[in-house]
Amino acid sequence: MKKPIYYLPGHGGVLQKGLGAALLARGHEVMGRETVGEFNRLPFGQQVEVIAQDLTAHFTQSDAQVIANSFGAYLFMHAQAQMQPFAGRVLLLSPIVGEFGSDELQRKTHLNFIPPRADLLYELAKKGTYPIPQNAEFHVGSEDWQSNPENVLALAQMWGVQSHMVPGSGHAIDRGYITQLLDRWLT
């Protein structure tokens, strides 16, 4: 089995389905936290602390890998905020980076979401105090209403890391794109 990957799925996600299943099929051991059950019932701050402890205990090497999706990426970024810069590689897919929604979106869909500590990532990035992972990249769909592409690209620019907008994709980035991305990223 290949080196383990620390995987954080989106809200309600489990490690052996979706992207986790794709990683397992490629021969990787998948570790991380499922965003369901007992872990999901923890307060946000405790979730962040558990992830930070996991990473500090088992994923400190320069060849360590983290893949986080949607709200899992939000959890990772908050855990990273209280750690030394992650030494390995980080792949953030459709990352929640703070509040999403707008007056227009609210009128059309009645949807708006403000996650816990919604402003923290931008505040730390603006101050230059966020402990930026040494090798990170962001991928977001151009039509993603949850991970506002403009906000994702702005945060990636503040961090000085790679960012990619996937044309025509929503929050669930096109499977073909993800397959090609994993082919490149995991080699």
Give, region by region, the residue ranges found by the protein language model.
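Active-site catalytic motif of lipid deacylating hydrolases and related acyltransferases
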Residues: 2-60
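Conserved alpha/beta-hydrolase "acid-adjacent" motif
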Residues: 16-17, 145-151, 174
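Short glycine-rich catalytic loops that host catalytic nucleophiles or stabilize transition states
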Residues: 33-37, 164-170
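Active-site nucleophile loop of the alpha/beta-hydrolase fold
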Residues: 35-38, 91-100
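Catalytic histidine-centered segment of alpha/beta-hydrolase-like enzymes
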Residues: 41-43, 169-179
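Gly/Ala-rich beta-loop-alpha elbow adjacent to hydrolase catalytic centers
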Residues: 67-77
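Active-site nucleophile elbow and catalytic-triad environment of alpha/beta-hydrolase enzymes
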Residues: 110-129
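Short beta-strand/loop motif that positions the catalytic acidic residue
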Residues: 132-133, 137-140, 144, 152
